[in-house]
Amino acid sequence: MKVIVTENKIQGGAKAFEIFKNEIKNGAKVLGLATGSTPETLYQNFINSDLNCSNLISINLDEYVGLTPDNPQSYHYFMRKHLFDKKPFKKSYVPDGMTKDVAATCKEYDQIIKDNPIDVQLLGIGRNGHIAFNEPGTPFDIGTHEVKLTENTIKANSRFFDNEDEVPKSAICMGTANIMDAKKVVLMAFGEKKAQAIKEMIEGPVTEQVPASILQKHPDVTVIVDKAAAQELDDKYKN
């Protein structure tokens, strides 16, 4: 893994954009994208740039089951708001959270990824080392699947809804096998609350109890962290 330490998330987003821009200029056509606050600075750099995205395909990591695309808490909505409405892509794939057949939708999403191999995959990381909704204990060889959200995740998400009963109880999520098939991975993490997860991902054993640790086995991973998220790392990783 290559580790890049920046002063803050603004610089981190700019550094991530440099990587994506260079990969696109070198022929990358399919981007694996993520949601949440971590990639917002990256997406802002996309929007502010003169980069033409009209020939790019994006494939998102996940989506809540039961949320319509126009629900402000859905990842369809997030991606339109933070990127696609201002920087249109040729084609953008996000799992169908309103599907009547989740298993079939997961198989279809695996086929989409197979038909459009991901050139650069963007990731964040959870405090417990999860990537996307792949929580500790998720098999490393799994493809796109339905995830039953943990009570902690449901409670954490309840602040976005009127009450906890409205919070989605499951999500459709790319598996670690899909993520590992990407040619290049860029993982971003900011803040001291991510420091322990970053340390375990990079320096700890490869274990399904730390889903992100599988990235140690990927041939091309760049980790972009601010100083706070890097504080637990061995000095050799700090530039």
Curated annotation (Swiss-Prot):
CDD domains reported for this sequence: GlcN6P_deaminase
Active site: 62 (proton acceptor), 128 (for ring-opening step), 130 (proton acceptor), 135 (for ring-opening step)
Pathway: Amino-sugar metabolism; N-acetylneuraminate degradation; D-fructose 6-phosphate from N-acetylneuraminate: step 5/5
One of the GO biological process terms: carbohydrate metabolic process
Keyword line: Carbohydrate metabolism, Hydrolase
GO CC terms, sorted: cytoplasm
GO molecular function: glucosamine-6-phosphate deaminase activity; identical protein binding
The protein's name: Glucosamine-6-phosphate deaminase
Biological source species: Lactobacillus helveticus (strain DPC 4571)
Gene: nagB
